[in-house]
Amino acid sequence: MKKVFVKTYGCQMNEYDSDKMVDVLNATQGMEPTDNVEDADVILFNTCSIREKAQEKVFSELGRMKALKAAKPDLVIGVGGCVASQEGASIVSRAPYVDVVFGPQTLHRLPDLINRRQQTGLSQVDISFPEIEKFDHLPPARVDGPSAFVSIMEGCSKYCSYCVVPYTRGEEVSRPFEDVLAEVAGLAEQGVREVTLLGQNVNAYRGAMGGTSEIADFALLIEYVADIPGIERIRYTTSHPKEFTSRLIELYGRCDKLVNHLHLPVQHASDRVLAGMKRGYSVLEYKSIIRRLRALRPDMSMSSDFIVGFPGETDADFDKLMAMVHEIGYDTSFSFIFSPRPGTPAANLHDDTPHEVKLRRLQLLQATIEENVQRISQSMVGTVQRILVEGPARKDPTELHGRTENNRVVNFALPGVPQAQRDRMIGQMVDVNVTQAFPHSLRGEFVVRQ
């Protein structure tokens, strides 16, 4: 049986796409995934171009594949994702041993691209944008555990000044309303209890409702997903403050299946910097969303993306960012130094801030966020948390592990509980009393419901 190895860079959208690459090759060519690159008949790199460092990692990885390709001439090497969209045929020019190059919207054509490469001996490149076509050609999802990603829309139409996503993934296109619900229902029938709805700007979803001219917004989609039997938790990422409607906020007051955790990227806390980024909202507007959400859910956990060192960022601008991090109390977040991307407006902005200053700012920001993370984890000690059990604990298979609503891994023992009963708990919701907080996980005790 042939095997496929996939290395994924970047966001959860890429993780979802990588799973679909495996699914489509399994359905059409009977390939099975492998974690050992040397065992693979097909090696795929699903790439990210959001920062220069991530992009260069891909070419470094490709360089290491040259010897493997020489030893196995029939090996197929493919590059997908956003670097593929951005670089296209130049990838083959730089690494002639690459066989196929495909974009996020053409991954469903992967079997045909591989076949054409094998028949013609020529590298194949397809980085077109056939909108939402790929979802019509993908096989049903293969379930691996009680949680699953569901892509509901593709692309981005916001054109932030620093971002390549609109150029590499195309404009915003939403999947039809009924198609999304059918996929979620199919996952629920296979034992999935938690879905994460995915999109570059997931709350910009506007899906056509079959047989009518009506359009479903994101809040309506969530309401319908919540009504699907078996679904107990709903997450989504990545949301955009500009698309955060009152309807969506109000949903947190009446939909218990929406978790108490939200990733809402602010990027910065200076209105001047936000304007330069072309984010389309003010700091006050962003804070208003948080205030209204926490009025409904006082324990709402917030995470974000942050960019430091954007051209023209002053010490005063950075101080505003740090003040907001303290004020909001952000949980685990993503933070980076500004990386100019070719073809974006921000790449042409004058930047006179020394790299050492940017690095110092980033380190301070990350240290403060980590303090918040540890404080939040410590505050959970002594509380009973509802856990979705994912499987045996990694370090001790006699224990189980799962996740809290705010996305923390909890390992817990079940003294006196027979193995067969433990196995049945996987995929179920259980109560766990948190007893210890560690840097990257929690520990607890199983609570028997009376």
Swiss-Prot record:
Q: Name one GO molecular function term.
A: 4 iron, 4 sulfur cluster binding
Which keywords has UniProt assigned to this entry? 4Fe-4S, Cytoplasm, Iron, Iron-sulfur, Metal-binding, S-adenosyl-L-methionine, Transferase, tRNA processing
SMART domains given for it?
Elp3
Return any one Pfam family short name.
UPF0004
Q: Which cofactor does it need?
A: [4Fe-4S] cluster
Residues that, per the record, bind [4Fe-4S] cluster 2: C156, C160, C163
Q: Which compartments is it annotated to reside in?
A: Cytoplasm
A cellular component term from Gene Ontology for this protein is: cytosol
Ranges for domain MTTase N-terminal: 2-119
Can you give the residue ranges of the TRAM domain? 378-448
Q: Where is the Radical SAM core domain?
A: 142-375
Q: What is its main location?
A: cytoplasm
Q: List residues binding [4Fe-4S] cluster 1.
A: C11, C48, C82
Cofactor comment:
Binds 2 [4Fe-4S] clusters. One cluster is coordinated with 3 cysteines and an exchangeable S-adenosyl-L-methionine.
Q: Does the keyword tRNA processing apply?
A: yes
Q: EC class of this enzyme?
A: transferase
Reaction catalysis annotation: N(6)-dimethylallyladenosine(37) in tRNA + (sulfur carrier)-SH + AH2 + 2 S-adenosyl-L-methionine = 2-methylsulfanyl-N(6)-dimethylallyladenosine(37) in tRNA + (sulfur carrier)-H + 5'-deoxyadenosine + L-methionine + A + S-adenosyl-L-homocysteine + 2 H(+)
InterPro entries per the UniProt record, alphabetical: Elp3/MiaA/NifB-like_rSAM, Methylthiotransferase, Methylthiotransferase_CS, Methylthiotransferase_N, Methylthiotransferase_N_sf, MiaB_methiolase, rSAM, rSAM_horseshoe
EC numbers, comma separated: 2.8.4.3
Keyword Iron belongs to the record: yes
Q: Report the family membership.
A: Belongs to the methylthiotransferase family. MiaB subfamily.
What is the protein's quaternary organization?
Monomer.
* Function comment: Catalyzes the methylthiolation of N6-(dimethylallyl)adenosine (i(6)A), leading to the formation of 2-methylthio-N6-(dimethylallyl)adenosine (ms(2)i(6)A) at position 37 in tRNAs that read codons beginning with uridine.
The protein's name in its UniProt record: tRNA-2-methylthio-N(6)-dimethylallyladenosine synthase
Q: Which organism is it from?
A: Cupriavidus metallidurans (strain ATCC 43123 / DSM 2839 / NBRC 102507 / CH34) (Ralstonia metallidurans)
Q: Upper lineage ranks? A: Bacteria, Pseudomonadati, Pseudomonadota, Betaproteobacteria, Burkholderiales
